[in-house]
Amino acid sequence: MDDKHDVVIPLGIKSYDNNFEIKVAVASIKKYFKCLNRIIIVTQIQPIKELGDDIVWIYQDDIYKHDKDANIIEKVRVAIEKVPDLTEDFIMWSDDQFITKDTEWSDTRPRYMKIYNESTLPWFLGMAKARIWYKRLLKCFARFRNNGFGCRFFNPHIPSPFNKNKFMKMCESVPYRIETGITIYSLYYNFIGEKGVPNFDEFHCTSGELNWGGCRWVGFYNSSMRKPEFVEKLKKMFDIK
């Protein structure tokens, strides 16, 4: 049995079907995250009673308009500052992520999708032409040595372990409050020199897929919430009314 660790969830205001996503995330954590200490939700919405009395709620607005992830970083920072006994190592979770089996801290190794170098540059450039998020990622890489070559693109759709002291050092070193090109996972892990492991044991639902290949970690796009069969499967898995 691993030591107990806190879970920090930066939560936005957009939700489908009466906060169904956060209900799924919290239910999966309570059911399967065996090293759970506390769940801490940082958000500007009112506490959701159905999640239980054991949730720690911290109020924080989304105050930045220039970059979405700047608000996520700020919420994690606020959790560190306002919860003095936050566990040294904690896991950051999103409401569009859940787990499907018993999980210990040793199962939470950071996963990367690709290493940014000369051979992968065409792929990254192609993705940046198609999606704004990848433009932000390339700008994130550019902060590091050698124009970012050697940086790893860490999976942004999987709960990931953070160290609160290292995270605060990143906050103090990177002007995320005013600069663009902020992608929290790749920024943090490349800042601390984390090598991670190639992505595995994870499935991302783009359109409500029901077969997750036995993966432990499952994330989903909002479009999956429009698939009744996907929603019903989650309700049954986690006994959500």
Residue locations for each model-derived region?
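Catalytic core and acceptor-binding pocket of nucleotide-sugar-dependent glycosyltransferases
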Residues: I132-S224
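A conserved donor-nucleotide-binding helix/loop in the catalytic core
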Residues: N19-K31, D62-W93
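Short acidic donor-binding/metal-coordinating loop in glycosyltransferase active sites
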Residues: Q44, S94-Q97
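Conserved donor-nucleotide/metal-binding helix-loop-beta segment in metal-dependent transferases, i.e.
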Residues: T100-W133
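Aromatic-acidic/polar surface patches that form glycan- and anion
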Residues: L11-I22, D69-I73, G126, N147, ...
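Short coil/turn segments at beta-strand junctions that form active-site/ligand-binding loops
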Residues: D3-H5, N37, L86-D89, D95
